[in-house]
């Protein structure tokens, strides 16, 4: 088994010359390699809808973790319910932070997402994912190279130093148009916020719509130097 510790033995390669640009092959390998010791960390963005559909074909009872920060858009929570109905066999886990919002306010002050967004992300996303990955050998992410400069070198299989795990990224070669073409082709549910200027959807407090011609992640932590929540640093 390929693990974080045995990374030097990595000789896995995949062709991207198929209908899913390698995604199905990558997922088939991942679930064969890790069996029950792999989880998909899903934010329920539009890429997530594609991955859930593909994963359901490979492993209908796969584990899916959603990092419920308690400050997501209502539309996101409603989408999760639709996904549960569409893919009833998937094991969707809504992972909560250890601190409630009230407890966080008492410890760190009101609106931590404004005063210290990095700490807020650590409490409400990074630490919960660490807990979710504690007993896993690998995890799946919907990263695409096209999304941003920080993601353009992502590979199908990555040694993830942040979580000392293997990170599997099946959609690295997909374009934004290809993602949407797949969603429409298979009549997949998606977050209606995508239709009103939100290409990337995170927490309600830190996500704004993006103007025409803007980068897909311009609406995340707008006005701040921050561009990533911290889950995807290599």
From Swiss-Prot:
This is Adenosine 5'-phosphosulfate reductase. The lineage of its organism: Bacteria, Bacillati, Bacillota, Bacilli, Bacillales. SUPFAM superfamilies: Adenine nucleotide alpha hydrolases-like. Keywords: Cytoplasm, Iron, Iron-sulfur, Metal-binding, Oxidoreductase. One of its GO terms (cellular component) is cytoplasm. The gene is cysH. InterPro entries: APS_reductase (IPR011798), PAPS/APS_Rdtase (IPR004511), PAPS_reduct_dom (IPR002500), Rossmann-like_a/b/a_fold (IPR014729). Belongs to the PAPS reductase family. CysH subfamily. Pathway: Sulfur metabolism; hydrogen sulfide biosynthesis; sulfite from sulfate. [4Fe-4S] cluster binds at residues 120-121, 203, 206. It comes from Bacillus thuringiensis (strain Al Hakam). Its EC number is 1.8.4.10. It catalyses: [thioredoxin]-disulfide + sulfite + AMP + 2 H(+) = adenosine 5'-phosphosulfate + [thioredoxin]-dithiol. Signal peptide: none annotated.
């Amino acid at each position: 088994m390929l693990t974080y510790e045995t990374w030097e033995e990595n000789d896995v390669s995949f062709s991207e010359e198929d209908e899913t640009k390698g995604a199905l092959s990558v997922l088939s390998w991942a679930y064969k390699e890790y069996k029950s010791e792999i989880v998909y960390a899903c934010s329920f963005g539009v890429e997530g809808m594609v991955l859930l559909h593909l994963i359901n074909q490979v492993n209908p009872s796969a584990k899916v973790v959603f990092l419920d920060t308690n400050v997501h858009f209502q539309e996101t929570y409603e989408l999760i319910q639709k996904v549960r109905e569409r893919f009833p066999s998937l094991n969707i886990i809504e992972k909560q932070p250890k601190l409630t919002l009230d407890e966080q306010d008492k410890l760190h002050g009101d609106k931590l997402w404004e005063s210290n967004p990095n700490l807020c992300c650590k409490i409400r996303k990074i630490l919960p994912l660490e807990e979710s990955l504690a007993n896993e050998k690998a995890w799946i992410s919907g990263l695409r190279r096209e999304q941003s400069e920080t993601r353009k070198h992502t590979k199908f299989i990555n040694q993830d130093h942040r979580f000392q795990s293997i990170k599997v990224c099946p959609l690295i070669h997909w374009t934004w148009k290809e993602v949407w073409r797949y969603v429409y082709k298979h009549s997949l549910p998606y977050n209606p916020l995508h239709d009103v200027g939100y290409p990337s959807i995170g927490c309600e407090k830190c996500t704004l719509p993006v103007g025409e011609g803007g980068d897909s992640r311009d609406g995340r932590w707008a006005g701040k130097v921050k561009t990533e929540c911290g889950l995807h640093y290599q």
